[in-house]
Amino acid sequence: MMKRFLMLYAFLLTAFTLLAHNNRVAGIDMVSYPGGKCMMYRLYLKDKDLDHNPYSVNRPEEFLSARSIERRKRQGLPIDLTDLPLAPAYEKAVTDAGIEIVGKSKWNNTLLIRIHKEKELRKLEGLDFISKMMKVFAAPDSVSQRMRSGVRRELNEWGNGAGFYGAADAQLKAMNGKRLHESNHLGKGKMIAVFDGGFMNVDKIPALHDIKLAGVKDFVVPQSKNIFSEMEHGTMVLSTMAANAPNFYVGVAPEAEYLLIRCEDERTESLAEEDYWASAAEYADSCGVDIINSSLGYHGFDDAATNHHYYEQDGKTALISQTASMCADKGIVCVNSAGNDGMGAWKKINFPADAKDILTVGSINEQGTNAAFSAVGPTADGRIKPDVMAYGSPTCVITGRGSIINDNGTSFSSPLIAGMVACLWQALPHKTAKQIIKLVRLAGNNQQHPDNVFGYGVPDFWKAYQTGKAIK
């Protein structure tokens, strides 16, 4: 994830101090990794054993919700073999061998397994349906202890902002989103899945009490006891869309439904998080979501040997990017932050921001120019990225303690676009995911000369609506 890396300077301590402050580093409490010493491997399966698989594309109601099936039907999209669950016989053979399955992806035909010693892999010898194995995670010795912050009452007693939208007014205005709101399109009937690492105090912050919550799910191994006690990043992302406190802070899609999914492990950076993301996307699809907001991105990991390379940015090499590229074919608009590496050595967008048929979102400042940190394109196969831009330097957000602050990052640009996509799609219900993506791009203020810094520019969502309405 695009984390804020904090340099920790520790001094040499005496042996007594080390003993007295066991498991502390530079004032931070350290604890053993909650999953214990373990490793995870991704197993690629050769097929779906169609001769014995009890599921059929002709009976999608057995593995997809009615809402998901209706979304495909509305857009003229078929149920295909990637939608079929994994072969039950293959899963059973793995578990019968004494191997724990902790994740799976039907779109990619993969399993995620957890073991505690490398020699356990020998148990899989002879299972000829496994075509490839890849190590995607090795547990660290310790991680920083996480604490849930309290909601401070005084931080939730805000003064009135500038008009109905309060502190969130400018970021909506920049996209000409008020016109859609004034025509009574605030995202009603659309479901947005929010992928993040936690949603601290979403269940307690007054401005978020009226959120239309469709559900919560956790795919990180090990799972959290409560995603509302995890990191606040997801809270800030969600607030830009869902908050509904008139005259204080109103988000861009206050009438949409929200499915909150934890698929980012803030304690570590590993390829396993791509497996979590894939599981999250498939779960969101099965629930019938219309839009995914993913303010997440990857390229460097704790194990540098597994780092991604620029030549892989083709929308299909990385598992996470291949998964994101499939969303539009399922009828889902995937919106992903570009990344914050514009000033670093990497500079490029992250994964899955390189995916095809998604909206990759960069950041602008208050003057309307691109933020220096906003990652750039193109993709390795020459596609323009980012696709569009939105406020991100700064964006006004609500923190996990309930305060309104300005914060920087493409993480907060992405949900502004995702929320407005919900409003646009509500207004144009007969459009497909790919048509909506095209309308948003063409409504950008740089659409005549798109480039790899500003993309198609900042979308005018009223213009997108007018254009879409004129096209039958």
What do the PLM-derived regions correspond to, one by one?
Residues 1-25:
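Bacterial Sec-dependent N-terminal signal peptides
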Residues 238-241, 261-265, 348, 388, ...:
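Hydrolase catalytic cores
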Residues 89-172, 178-181, 356:
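Autoinhibitory propeptides
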Residues 21-96, 100, 118-144:
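Primarily auto-inhibitory N-terminal propeptides
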Residues 42, 103, 110-114, 191-196, ...:
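Structural recognition of the beta-strand scaffold that forms the well-ordered cores
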Residues 203-214, 363-412, 448:
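Catalytic-core environment of secreted peptidases
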Residues 34-36, 132, 168, 178-217, ...:
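Subtilisin-like serine protease catalytic core
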Residues 244-247, 260-354, 380-383, 400-414, ...:
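Substrate-binding/access-modulating region of protease and related hydrolase catalytic domains
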